[in-house]
Regions:
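Extracytoplasmic/secretory soluble proteins
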Residues: 1-402
Length: 402
């Protein structure tokens, strides 16, 4: 796929991912060396790159490349403007074209496996107490999986910047959305540090209580991200609090390959509160623009126009379809109504990590669309195509939604 895209755009990008370093460590090393890749997404460390003068300003290029300009309204583009008056990066993950076709909660939640819900008769779970109650009862009746693997009631990821998995819960349990490191109380227009609230105190008391009962993974405080993902990939972890994007891309395809989805190991999100009857606003991801990071072009790039031209091409519908749907007749089909779909074999291939590595090329950190294709019919990405979302679900997940 990369070769097909290269022939059509004239550009081939070699992507390099962090291994064994935080974004701050990697960015610090790059800045110290003074040589930068053509493109960079520094995560939470974009500001040091900006301060080092390592980034190219976008101001003279946005209007030249209509696909890029179309990503945001004029007011939204202003959100990316830095204190020197220029724009240096853009977030590529939140852009919706046309009708919203969201099928997945892509934000943070308390997650629970559908096998637990099915066993319990799909109970109403409103509070943190309800959540741990059903996990405790399931564990008492089902201490192991079918193959003898010990179930892990609840684990927590705390490594480095991902400590949000343990820290953020207080704001959700108080009924607020994810506004970063604080609660924004719009009733009185005040900012509250959720770490100091009574709800957060009760949350940590509950974790202590569950830890004493043996319901929390004893390795939670020292496990690495890779160890955490390895545990989830076994299907043994009944629940956790995390961002969907932080675990799903790594474990969902593994479940399909190993048949764990057929055993009810997929996770569904729950919008819990600390007490019953409280309002909750946990599902608000698409409404919030994150302008703090994104893709940037560095001063080491020898052909800045070519870099912007490639990003612009990434948003052409033909290239976008190649990135996310693949090649018609090989990776997907088109029915008599012009709707894209996959055969069962194509779905298996799309979930196979080996096939993904050898054949697909999503350029996942480059500009992209969610929402509706410019043909007005299809979803920009397969996960949001209603037929693919439904056909891609294992029976235990289908039963849960019913």
């Amino acid at each position: 796929m990369q070769e097909i895209i290269a022939k059509k755009t004239g550009v081939r990008v070699k992507e390099t991912w962090l291994t064994g370093q935080t974004d701050a460590e990697a960015v610090g090393t790059i800045i110290a060396g003074g040589e930068y890749p053509d493109f960079i997404n520094g995560g939470d460390s974009m500001k040091p790159l900006y301060d080092a003068g390592a980034l190219v300003a976008w101001d003279d290029y946005i209007d030249k490349y209509p696909n890029i300009k179309e990503m945001y309204s004029d007011a939204e583009w202003e959100s990316f403007r830095q204190d020197d008056g220029h724009i240096y990066w853009a977030n590529v993950f939140q852009n919706k074209y046309g009708e919203d076709k969201t099928t997945t909660h892509n934000d943070e939640a308390f997650w629970i496996q559908v096998r637990v819900l099915e066993w319990a008769g799909y109970p109403e779970i409103e509070t943190l107490d309800d959540y741990f109650d059903v996990i405790e009862r399931y564990m008492e009746a089902n201490p192991t999986m079918d193959d003898g693997t010990a179930n892990i009631p609840y684990t927590i990821l705390c490594e480095d910047w991902r400590y949000f998995c343990i820290e953020n819960a207080g704001q959700f349990l108080d009924g607020y959305p994810n506004d970063g490191s604080v609660i924004v109380d719009t009733d009185n227009m005040k900012i509250v540090d959720y770490n100091t609230t009574e709800t957060t105190k009760r949350y940590f008391e509950k974790l202590n209580e569950e830890y004493a009962k043996g319901m929390i993974d004893p390795e939670f405080a020292t496990q690495t991200y890779d160890e955490y993902i390895a545990k989830l990939s076994t299907g043994a972890v009944l629940g956790m609090c995390d961002q969907w994007w932080d675990f799903a891309y790594n474990v969902n395809d593994v479940y399909k390959q190993q048949g764990l989805d057929l055993k009810g190991c997929n996770y569904v999100p729950l919008g819990l509160t600390i007490d019953k009857g409280m309002d909750q606003m946990w599902h608000t991801y698409g409404d919030t623009l994150n302008a703090s990071n994104g893709i940037a072009i560095t001063t080491s790039c020898k052909d800045v126009d070519a870099a912007f031209r490639f990003m612009n091409s990434c948003l052409d519908q033909e290239i976008h379809d190649l990135r996310f749907w693949g090649v018609e007749g090989i990776d997907y089909e088109v029915d008599e109504n012009g709707l894209y779909y996959r055969t069962e074999e194509q779905r298996v291939n799309a979930a196979d990590t080996g096939y993904q590595a050898s054949h697909l090329c999503t350029y996942s950190y480059f500009p992209q669309w969610l929402g509706t294709s410019k043909d007005g019919k299809n979803a920009m990405q397969p996960a949001e195509q209603p037929s693919e979302f439904q056909n891609g679900m294992a029976e235990p997940l289908v039963k849960c939604f019913k």
